[in-house]
Regions:
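N-terminal transmembrane-helix/juxtamembrane module of multi-pass inner/ER membrane proteins
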Residues: 1-79, 120-122, 126-128, 132-133
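Short hydrophobic alpha-helical membrane-anchoring segments
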Residues: 30-36, 113-116, 120, 158, ...
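Alpha-helical transmembrane spans of integral membrane proteins, capturing the lipid-embedded, hydrophobic core
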Residues: 27, 104, 108-112, 203, ...
């Protein structure tokens, strides 16, 4: 079996940092999911504030911005991110970095399974709007689009940070990916298919998952090349 190269001191430190950041985000997610599950007033106030901020004035049917939002939200669907994650994982495998490829694909896949389980557990109905802008089915919390974008694009951004690319390239691509994550989260509230707390929960869980899974890879899965 082929493993990845030896972990460096820098990567050991990165694994610890990512693990700590991931745990913090998991704790924040725990606060949000408990607030949603027990219908806390602060969650309702948060939802009302951001719904008014994002959807006032209301979306205009046929507008260029609404068309762009419809288009962009497609890039956070699991039916797109999961197959691409598989292709990326296979590409890493062809590069003799099997552990990295397996980690990337199963990190995304397990995140999707966790999402579906949490939706059934919380069973939060979707918001009722005055007009359906896009069809959405299933329960509302957490937002699948927010989680998928934070997990998939967040994992790509983290991998980029620890690559050999120049700092300028890293910064440009990382900023683009982070902007894309926030845009995907904004879209779901703008279209009226999620509460802001759904999006916040999906974002926090996606970032927590990507940080902790990369920490696991850097800390335990990377090994010197050897054959078995």
């Amino acid at each position: 079996m082929v493993f990845d190269r030896t972990i460096s001191v820098r990567e050991k430190k990165a694994a610890k940092t990512l693990g700590i950041v991931g745990i913090v985000f998991f704790i924040l997610f725990g606060i949000v999911i408990s607030g949603v599950a027990f219908q806390k007033e602060w969650v309702q106030q948060l939802d009302l504030f951001f719904i008014d901020l994002i959807r006032n004035p209301a979306p205009i049917q046929g507008s260029a911005w609404l068309s762009f939002v419809f288009f962009s939200t497609w890039f956070a669907q699991s039916k797109l991110t999961t197959p691409i994650a598989l292709l990326i994982g296979l590409w890493f495998g062809f590069q003799k970095r099997i552990a990295l490829g397996v980690w990337f694909f199963f990190s995304i896949l397990l995140g999707e399974f966790t999402l579906k389980s949490l939706k059934l557990l919380v069973a939060r109905p979707r918001p009722v709007t005055n007009g359906e802008l896009v069809f959405a089915h299933g329960f509302s919390f957490p937002s699948g689009h927010a989680l998928a974008s934070a997990l998939f694009y967040g994992s790509l951004a983290l991998l980029l940070c620890y690559s050999n690319a120049s700092n300028r390239i890293k910064t440009i691509i990382a900023v683009i990916l982070l902007f894309w994550i926030f845009l995907m989260s904004y879209d779901r509230v703008y279209l009226g298919v999620h509460y802001p707390s759904d999006v916040l929960g999906g974002f926090l869980l996606g970032i927590a998952w990507s940080c902790c899974s990369l920490a696991l890879y850097l800390g335990f899965l990377k090994r010197p090349y050897k054959a078995a």
